Amino acid sequence: MDEELDYLWETLGLEITADLWPERDKIHPTLRPAITVVQAKYRRASFLIMRMSWHAGLPDLKRIQASLVELSGMPTVISEAHLEQRQRERLQQQRIPFICPGVQAYLPFMDEEYWSGKPN
């Protein structure tokens, strides 16, 4: 998750710390090997960042993100390097947080909605 944290620091100036999510055993056993989940902290906010080990489609990402929100009770950010502009727009319309390192970050649960973008 260093790429995501570096991007948030270098682009937005957000100094976020993160460690592996301590409640990882709540993730379904068949999904556990395919997902990395860290618990991130920024100021007083605590949230999860999830990244799949393969390029998952948007419906799968949204389904897994929703289940992690339910399991953890925390906002959960999707990290995916290959989101197309229309996919990012769709996530924003649905207020689903995401990081597309080097392109855009959308974190609506923070005090402000941080985002930065470069055209595709």
How should these model regions be labeled?
Residues 112, 116-119:
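N-terminal intrinsically disordered, cationic/polar leader segments
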Residues 1-96:
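DNA-contacting interfaces and partner/effector-binding or oligomerization modules
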Residues 95-107:
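Charged, structured surface patches that assemble and position nucleic-acid processing machinery
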